[in-house]
Amino acid sequence: MRQLKKSASRSMLALFALAFCLPLPVQAADDGERFRDIYEREWDFRLREFPLFASYVGVHDYDDVLGRVSESDQARGHAVWKSIAAELGEISCERLSHDDCIDYRIFAKQIDNFIAEYETRAYLLTFNSDGGFFMEWGRLPEETRFRDVQDYRNYLARLHEL
């Protein structure tokens, strides 16, 4: 009887240990999926907020707009990036794959930089040694594709926004 009790206790202990370990891979998968969802949502936001950048990376959904840069637009972007940072804070890099962890760290740094640029009001600088708000306009003809009538219409729509 004692032997049976010991065996049952060991089995229960092993079962408990196994049950304790099982949620970790599920959590890792959940964190990986959450991370992908976060960066995909942020990427869509980034393309909408920076249509010239979208065109540059080959996304032509916003070829007819320049983007908005008012104080309220800056504040809205800041709120989105603060929210993204909070969501990222709920994900542990240790629960991600090695490659996702690297991507996570790079992405988190980009988000931190967007937040810092707003908080230091860097958007008020019209130009610096790296570029500037108005400099993008001068490159519009070079960076616009002119393959069909719609491309010309998109270009004219952007010029109209100036």
Describe every region a protein language model picked out.
Residues 2-14:
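Bacterial N-terminal signal peptides that target proteins for export
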